[in-house]
Amino acid sequence: MSIISQLSKSLPKNIVISGEENTRPFECDGLSVYKQKPLAVVLPNKLSQVKKVLEICRKNNTPIVTRGAGTGLSGGAMPIKDSVVLGLSKLTKVISINPQEQTAIVEPGVRNLAISEAADEYGLYYAPDPSSQIACTIGGNVAENAGGVHCLKYGLTVHNIESIKIMNIEGEELVFSRQDEGLGLLALMTGSEGLLGIITEITVKLTKKPEVAKLVMAGFDSVRDCANAVADIIKNGIIPAGLEMMDEFAIEASEEFARPGYPLGSKALLLCELDGSDELVSNDLETVLSLLSKASSVRVSESEEERLLLWKGRKSAFPAVGRISPDYYCMDGTIPKRHLGDVLEKINALSKHYSLRVANVFHAGDGNLHPLILYDAGVPGELEKTEEFGNEILKLCIDVGGSITGEHGVGVEKLDAMCYQYSDSELDVFHQIKAAFDPQSLLNPGKAVPSLHRCAELGNMHVHHGNLPHPELERF
């Protein structure tokens, strides 16, 4: 009996999707340049159904790719050949909210923004706010360790969860908590991209809404002056709720798309949000304004509506750029903040070298870059040129002491770059961790951690007499 027949026989027929046309919507995630149709898609609405899918796939040695809302930007939820996609988007219960403890227990398919909506009546909200928060799920956020424009002060997903439940490949439920002694397994699972287990329940930390929030918008005549302002704000002990930069191209695209009132003609834009008590915000605002002497324009939000509108422009940057070009490639690297100006200048030089336009938006407070490379996949060779450009940006991040990913994950997009960032001994550890949780390598295989052979082919791993190191390790 085929695996599709087994799934259809063991589960409600309305949650099993098969057939080439029916599975097409699941052939990629937000990184649509890479596509692969799965054997089948299962959309369980009960945890018992998740367990049954794992059981059937394990017995048939069939790979499982877990999917949330499909908003990821690294190909982490892209199916692999002959795989089953396990979509968790129907597991949408907000199980409980504890306003005293400031926590909420939710299923993995709950949307990021829906948590804040559910907690609003208690004066609480969920702080991490990726640009896709209206659609992305908390399970996907945990899998990628998502951040957002407010991560500088309030942290990434890993800083805002108390515990998670996962189901391993054997169907066994495991619980990882911030209170656990010993190894930080909660942190290990956060950002594991579906390689180690299926996230089935999350206890998130809720944050009290600030008394006051003000957003300062400053335009600059040079990117370097804007980057220097970022450094000055941090050096003066200010911890903004959000600290974002955009270059001229991103400013123009966002203004055309969302009409937030950005200063057209500026070479760079700084958005600095200050929140807390009225006294704290007033004092911090005075300090920040004194540090913006080189800004060509400065505006401070006067209402909540204005603050949200100014943020809307930044959060609309990706779709705004998407309207300008047939395709765009969104990068995600991190660098030390002191290198912001230099790195942006080098990215612009690479843009000229490859004859591809770039819009730069990034979380300036923690050095998380999001260059958007514009290209046309219909032009022969342009995708390959774009990928090469993207890899050069990631190498640049590594060269200045940064990382190849800040919040989008590795997925399939950055597998080659992993070979540049990590040594063979470090990849050895990654493979051993994967094998400890998933001995058959059925959970999202081929993602996040490159095979040793792949790195050897790239010339970043020594091969002695034709033999790869660590022959005892799995090759996937």
What are these model-derived regions, one by one?
Residues S423-F476:
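Intrinsic disorder at enzyme termini
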Residues K93-M246, L443, N460-F476:
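FAD-binding subdomain of flavoenzyme oxidoreductases
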